[in-house]
């Protein structure tokens, strides 16, 4: 660990890891500070993400995907419901522990500490 860095990223979740990866790829020194002992544990929020949104940043790995989302059904308290089938874009339910950890490894391999 160095005494100084060009960038300090607070939080090693997906956003922090992606920020650290981009900074490291740009040739700057970066340190990620994470309060939890293990990246991706505990999971902080939902596991759903769209394929196009994720693919803009990184190609999804098969071991990240718990399930593929092809439709959504929303039901209101009064039982009114809306159902949508995704014809062009699908999404994923992610294994967040694996996903978060892998993103932190990508950042580390690019030079983030």
Functional labels for PLM-detected ranges:
Residues 68, 74-113:
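Conserved N-terminal helical subregion
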Residues 56-72:
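A short alpha-helix-loop-beta-strand transition element characteristic
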Residues 12, 22, 26, 38, ...:
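Predominantly flavin-linked oxidoreductase catalytic cores and closely associated redox partners
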Residues 8, 21-44:
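Glycine-rich FAD pyrophosphate-binding loop
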Residues 1-15, 31:
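Beta1/beta-strand and adjacent pyrophosphate-binding region of the FAD-binding site
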Residues 17-18, 48:
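Short alpha-helical segment within the catalytic ATP-binding CA
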Residues 27, 57-61, 111:
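Glycine-centered loop/turn motif at secondary-structure junctions
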